[in-house]
Amino acid sequence: MKLGVFTPVFGTLKLDEVLVKVRRLEHVQALELGTGGWPGSDHIDLSALLDKKPCVAEYRQKIADAGLSISALSCHSNPLHPDAATARAADDVFRKSVRLAEQLEVPVVVTFSGCPGDSEGATRPNWVTAPWPPEFLDILDWQWEKKAIPYWQDAAQFAGDHGVKVALEAHPGFIVYNVDSALRLRKAVGPNLGVNFDPSHLFWQGVDVPAAIRALGDAIFHFHAKDVAIDPHNVAVNGVIDTKTYRRMAERSWLFRSVGWGHDELEWKRIVSALRLSGYDYVMSIEHEDALASVDEGLQAAVDMLSRVILTEPPVQAWWT
């Protein structure tokens, strides 16, 4: 297992500057690159690289010369959006990201499952969170059977044809937001579709993260190291479903934090142990979205914590059995 960094945090920097900065972060060995959608594409240009072998080779070499690898290409967006143009744009960046991942020899593309509307005439997504009134269940059935499953059957097949795995980040607001929904879609689509496991979206739902990791097992294709802090006072008053903007930090029930600032070192040791028990031995990619810390301070805090808990060497053979 090794540490990586998700690059949107360096959106104001050029790639060469990013490489210099990351090389100074001891223990970090990989980059997760945004290729479009919500992460943006500040450090890799799909159109400039795709199907241009010399450019692809030069880009790969630049990353390698910095002592780094690329863990994933990430294009988080909503390919199920009821607005056709929005959905087409999301699908286009996903497919281009898959093709470029193949050419860069990157094994996985990360995105969201997306969320449809409630009918063919919808213009905005509709995330259903309750089984009652009963029409909500009708909406859910339609979303899954008519939109999510058909789209991802085709998209995962496309990725598989290019030797690339699809890792969906379980995120509230989308069809896949927890273990149950992730496994439901994987069962319908096939083993080339799995999960980008981000504990920050599960902690505040009340999920025991190590238990969720064990439940997903080999469906975990990539991992985001990001923490969340629960505000006990605000939760006591309003619960955990919170639509306040992230700028209203003091009023929110939870906030994204640097690793270690939401959950302690023991909890992250439990997470690393669960990943190893589940067979995951790839990258823990640090995603910095802590509005209370600077980029440098927040990233360093995450690296310091994770470098103490990550297991980088193969496990011992149990001679005591």
Give names to the regions the model predicted.
Residues M1-A30, A57, A64-A66, A84, ...:
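Histidine-acidic metal/acid-base catalytic patches
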Residues E17, E58, K62-D65, P79-G194, ...:
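Active-site acidic/histidine proton-transfer and metal-coordination neighborhood
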Residues L31-L33, I70-S74, P107-G114, V166-E169, ...:
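Short beta-strand segments at enzyme active-site cores
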Residues E32-E58, G114-E120:
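Glycine-rich, proline-tolerant flexible connector loops at the mouths of alpha/beta enzymes
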Residues G36, N78, G114, V228, ...:
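Flexible loop residues that form catalytic
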Residues I44-C55, P133-P150, R248-D264:
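A short acidic, glycine-rich active-site loop
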Residues S47-L50, G117-W132, V235-K244:
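Aromatic- and acidic-residue-enriched segments that line the glycan-binding/catalytic groove
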Residues I70-A72, V128-P131, R248-E251:
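Short, basic/glycine-rich phosphate-binding loops at helix/coil junctions
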